Amino acid sequence: DLTVKKGDILLTKENADTTIGDQGYTLEIGDSITIKSTTYQGIFFGTRSVLQALVASGDALTINKGEARDYAKYEYRKFMLDVARKYMPMWYLKDFVKYASWYKFTDIQVHLNDTSYNGHSRFRLESDIPGLTATDGYYTKGEYRDFQYYAEDYGIRIVSEFDTPAHSAVFIDNNSELGFDGTHLDIRLNSDKKETVYKFIADLYEEYMGGENPVFVT
């Protein structure tokens, strides 16, 4: 049997409130602290509240006794990191995940391709397509896969984004047959290129989402 002692923090799904959604949680604070939720994410958000209360108490490192019932007003709380225009090393992305989790964000959209303000196009993932991957900073498939699992541990989902059919200069620079100008893929109704474009994009997604060990996992 589990015995909760003075000063313990118990994280549990047992007898959790099912009326406050997947992100909701309850706090019971006495000589010990109990955080209940129906999901891992809800429990994790509860731990952030406990940490925030401890930080707010200053050197005292104490929390007032009582009960709390917390749930999300907005289900999705997200923002975008434009790593295409401005490369951010993996250590920075992981630090940002921890920062975002403190404020109980749920999603981080990672913008993986675009045309930079200096006119240079970038694709920030390791790719099987020769010449597509940026040379001034990119993420290997393995480290990007691990990054998504890392974020998941902090209650955050990584939403990976390829920007098409506009903002697609990096694909056109790699294969000029894909575009009708410098930045737009040619999917016009009367274009004889559109089937080639569709296949290119489908193959690109298959590279990262297909197989037994996909790169995009969340």
Q: Which ranges hold each PLM region?
A:
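Substrate-binding cleft of carbohydrate-active enzyme catalytic domains
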Residues: 75-218
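Contiguous, structured surface segment used for ligand recognition
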Residues: 1-73
